[in-house]
Amino acid sequence: MKIEKTCKCIKDFTVDEYVFHKGREYQVDVYPLYYQIYQNGGWDDYIFISSDEEFNEYFKLIE
């Protein structure tokens, strides 16, 4: 599923959804207790997200 928004309630994600932000693609993997985001399949930008606030803050930081 392709998502064109960056600020989205993270509980709405399912495994292998994608976020597009300023021309970059981020995959969002959802697990019961945490969320993972990484850019273009690369581990360099791989992060763990545990709340909606952290998710939205991450995309604010990379603007």
Please annotate each region the language model reported.
Residues M1-I3, K60-E63:
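Short intrinsically disordered terminal tails
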Residues M1-K11:
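SH3-family beta-barrel domains
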Residues T14-Y58:
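Acidic, low-complexity, intrinsically disordered interaction modules
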